[in-house]
Amino acid sequence: MRDASRPVRDTKDSVTEGARTLDLASCANTKERLLRVAEYLFAREGVWSARVRDINELAGQRNASALHYHFGSRRRLIKAVMLRHQLKIDAEQDPLLDELEQRADYTARDILEIVVVPLVARLDSPSGRDFLRIIPQILRKLSGDLRQGITIRLTMSRIIDLLDACLGALPQPIRRERLVVYALMISSLCANYAEFIDSGIPSVLDSRAFATHLVDVISAALCAPDTVTPEAR
């Protein structure tokens, strides 16, 4: 018996889950269909829990090896799902970071506005909301890397370096913990709001107001006074 809680294909280009429909009509080819379905299921079932069989089936692929043919492994599929959004976000952020780095008077708030605006813009599309809901699932390793001062993506490294410079008066262990707080707050709050929108409940704030709210609370957390005693560090 089919699990009624699981998504089901109802047409070639449509997948229904409860009252919501995943539209695949805009996907130009098999690879894009697999990416969109994977993104959708990863957001709801987890990047490690979503079943490859379900991704193939909901993407309309009878060949059980279709996903493996296009991506090779689950890890590569996860990377492809993230990069389809992240590369566009990086392209929006990089020229703004170029301008910021020419200034001597930038603040943490200035940096956060560059980070937050393109992320929050993803709330306006189903695919973007799924992307935001996936980010916290892969953040465990990133938070560990930040504590060690490690970043991988060039744009992320630039952002972290700029934020770190704004926190220069704080001891290094505290600065690194503040950067973890930044990453956890921005990812979890965006993911939570994306899920809230997907629930169908009317939004409390529109995208612009939510972006301003994020910048307010995260800049306050980053720049909060340090009262940790030296003996505790």
Regions found by a protein language model. Give the residues of each.
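Basic, helix-initiating cap at the start of DNA-binding domains
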Residues: 2-45, 54, 58, 76, ...
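An amphipathic alpha-helix adjacent to DNA-recognition modules
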Residues: 31-36, 71-94, 98
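Helix-turn-helix
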Residues: 47-76, 80
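Hydrophobic alpha-helical connector segments
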Residues: 94-129
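Helix-loop "lid/cap" segments that line or gate small-molecule binding pockets
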Residues: 114-125, 134-143, 165
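Amphipathic C-terminal alpha-helical segment
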Residues: 121, 137-147, 175, 179-202, ...
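Amphipathic alpha-helical packing segments from all-alpha helical-bundle domains
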Residues: 129-132, 143-167, 177
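All-alpha amphipathic helical-bundle segments outside canonical DNA-binding/catalytic cores
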Residues: 167-183, 206-209
